[in-house]
From Swiss-Prot:
Zinc found in the keyword field: no
This protein's name: Phylloseptin-N2
Organism: Pithecopus nordestinus
Primary location recorded for the protein, binned into one broad class: secreted
Its biological purpose: Antimicrobial peptide with low activity against Leishmania species (L.amazonensis and L.infantum). Shows low cytotoxicity against mammalian cells in models of peritoneal macrophages.
Length: 18
């Protein structure tokens, strides 16, 4: 599960920067 966190964080960051 921990390996999925980076992808989730990067996705959230991309939405915030959007």
């Amino acid at each position: 599960f921990l390996s999925l966190i980076p992808s989730l964080v990067s996705g959230a960051v991309s939405l915030v920067k959007k």
